[in-house]
Amino acid sequence: MADKKKFPNPAFFRARTEMDWRAQAANLKEVGSIALELIKETDWKAFGKKQKDHFLDNMNRVAREARAVAGMSCAQRKDLLLNGEKQLGTLYRKGDMATVRREWRGVESTLIDFAGWLKTWGMLLGTFSKDLIPALNTTFWYRWMISYMCCVSFMDKNTMGQRGNALRMSHLMTYDIFRYVAENLVFLAKCDKKNGNSSELNKKVVLFDEMTMGQIMAGFPDLLGIPYQLMPVFLVSEIDQLTCVPYIDAVESFGLPADCCPVPSSECGALVIDALPHMGKCFISSSMPCDGSTMASSYMSRRFPDLPVFHLCFPVRYEDEETVQMGAEDIRACIKFIEEQTGAKWSWDAYFSAMKRFNEETRYELEKWEVNKTAYPQIIGPSYELFRKWNYEMDGGIDPRVMKTCRKVNDLLMQSYQ
C-alpha cells in the first residue's frame, strides 16, 4: 500500500504559505538598487566590444565548419550525419565556460538528447509551477538559486560525447536527480520564514546535515526530510564551482582558519551571511564525513537557536561490535527525538518497505559494476557517478519512482552489453 501513495506527498505542495509581502517588497527594492548600481558601473563599451568579438568569432566558426564539411569525402559526411562530430574541444571558445553551440551527436542520438532535454525542462517548469511565487522569489533572496538556472547546461556537459543507450541512461539518471532537487527547492522556498513562511509545512519538516544518510526518514512517511545544506551549498557547487567562494571568504573573515575543508567552511559561511533558509521543526547533525561537520553544526545552533538539534555521532570503527551497539543506541535516540519534536510515530512497515527498494536498487548497482569490470563497460561518465552518490545518500529507497529508473537503466545496460 505504501508504494501506491503519491511521492512526495501532494499535501506538502498544497500547504498554505504566509508570505510577508512588505518584507518581499523591501527586499525587492534592495535587489533593484543593487541591480541599478551594477548597470551604472558596467563598462558598456567593453561589453559591446566583447559581443562584437563573439559575433565575428561565430561567423568565422560557421565558415570554418562549412569548409571542413565541404572538404569531407562522402563516407566522412555520412559518418558525421549518423554518428556525430568528434572534435568536441572546438565547442568551447577560449576563456568561456559555456559551449558556443550544442553538440551534434548524429541524427538518432541528437533526437534522444533533445527528447531528454525537453522532458527535463517540462519537469522543471511543472515542479516549480506547483508554488511558483515563493520558488521564483528565492532568486531575490539567495545568490545560489541563480546558479540553478544553468542546470540544463550542466546536464549537457555531463553527457558530452555520449551516444545511443549510454546517452539514454545518462538522461534517465540525471532526470531523477533534477526532479529531487527541483521538488526540494520548492519546499525550501515554501518553508523559509523570509519567503513562503508556511507554518503548516514547517511542522512536518525534519532537516538533516547534508552528509547524514537520509534513510532514517524512511520510517516517518508522513514527514518531509530535507538535507539542509545540499541544495544551497554542496550540490550547487557541482554546477557552478564559483558559488561557494563568497561563503568561504565570509567565514574566513569571521575567523575560521583557511586550512579547513571547504565543504563545512562553505556551510558556515552561508550561515554567517544569512544565505540559508530559516525553516524546519528540528535539525539532525552528524560527524559525517569529518569533524568539520561537527564544527558546522555549532554554527547552525548559534544562527538558529530556536531550532532543536540532535547530534548523531557515527562510529569510525563501524565493524567493531561495541561501536555497532553504540551506533544503534544513537539511532534509537535520534528516532525518539524526531517523534518528540514532530509528534509523528516511527513506522517499521514504511521503513522496511523503503529498505527493500534500496536493496533492490543496490543489486542493480552491483550489476553495473560487474558489466563495467569487463572489457566492454557500458555506463560511464559524471551522470552515473552523481546518480549513485545521490541514490545511496539522499534517496536511499525512499522515493518509489527511482525503482522504475533503475529497471530502465539496467535493461538498457544489458541490452547494450549483450
Predicted features and spans:
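Active-site and donor-binding regions of nucleotide-sugar-utilizing enzymes
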Residues: 232-326
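A charged, amphipathic alpha-helical module
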Residues: 32-41, 46-51, 55-204, 336-418
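Histidine-anchored nucleotide/phosphate-binding helix
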Residues: 210-226, 298
